[in-house]
């Protein structure tokens, strides 16, 4: 068996300006959307709140209400009022995951310009990690020169090279990765997060891992079987032999 490693987007620490908003979002988003809306409303009404934090909170609330076009205006206002625009993009991606707006995540990543330096290394790493698990290695390459030196980012570049060396058109990688996420959402399956498992020594072996809140092993087997059938029925051109997609339980994630 090949030695493997896994890339999963690692969410950055929130800047102090957005710490309370970020805590509210991540505390309540997976437990009670009603409570989250209540807490966001309370937060927005606070006095002495920075304009960027207020605009970001309004954007999050509108995203969760599926009012995407109105939310976009507030995201833009928040970014223009803050020095932490990359962090705000990370928070925006988190809201998209909650709403299963996976194509919106890809579109956001595609708007990232080439970068050669950054004051937000953790946020930039999260965005680059998100790009690789969305099947967008070209976006990672736009950011590579600004990524901080770390073992984690060395792994990110290794995973990116795996996708590149399969010689699969990026549009095909992206479309099939995206189709799987959308198919799962249509089945009523909530995606918690995702990652890319890749071989450390073989540059053409990788597995997109989609983590769902499912404890029943038989149910997971059934989901994966139906997923394989969906892919074979939907796409005339399969992914290369070394590239696979599988659904796993969130319980498998090593939280140590």
Residue ranges and their predicted role:
Residues 1, 43, 93, 100-101, ...:
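Charge-rich, low-complexity amphipathic helices
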Residues 1-11, 20-24, 239-256:
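Catalytic core of pol beta-like nucleotidyltransferases
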Residues 14-152:
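Alpha-helical protein-protein interaction scaffolds
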Residues 16, 24-31, 35, 154, ...:
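Alpha-helix boundary/N-cap detector
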Residues 142-143, 150-173:
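N-terminal presequence-like segments and adjacent domain-start helices
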Residues 162-256:
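Helical anchoring/docking segments at protein termini
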């Amino acid at each position: 068996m090949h030695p493997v490693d896994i890339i999963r987007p690692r969410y950055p620490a929130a800047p102090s300006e957005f710490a309370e908003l970020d805590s509210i979002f991540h505390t309540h988003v997976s437990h009670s959307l009603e409570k989250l809306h209540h807490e966001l409303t309370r937060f927005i009404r606070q006095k002495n709140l920075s304009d960027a934090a207020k605009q970001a909170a309004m954007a999050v609330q509108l995203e969760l209400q599926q009012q995407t076009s109105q939310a976009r205006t507030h995201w833009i206002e928040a970014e223009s009022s803050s020095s932490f625009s990359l962090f705000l993009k990370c928070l925006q991606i988190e809201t998209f995951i909650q709403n299963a707006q996976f194509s919106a995540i890809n579109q956001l990543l595609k708007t990232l310009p080439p970068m050669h330096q950054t004051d937000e290394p953790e946020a930039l790493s999260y965005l680059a990690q998100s790009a690789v698990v969305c099947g967008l290695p070209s976006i990672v390459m736009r950011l590579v020169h600004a990524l901080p030196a770390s073992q984690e980012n060395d792994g990110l570049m290794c995973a990116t090279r795996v996708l590149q060396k399969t010689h699969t058109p990026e549009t095909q990688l992206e479309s099939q990765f995206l189709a799987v996420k959308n198919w799962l959402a249509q089945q009523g399956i909530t995606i918690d997060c995702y990652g890319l498992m890749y071989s450390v020594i073989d540059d053409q072996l990788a597995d997109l891992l989609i983590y769902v809140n499912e404890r029943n092993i038989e149910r997971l087997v059934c989901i994966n079987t139906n997923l394989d059938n969906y892919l074979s029925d939907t796409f005339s051109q399969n992914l290369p032999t070394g590239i696979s997609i599988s659904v796993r339980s969130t319980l498998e994630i090593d939280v140590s």
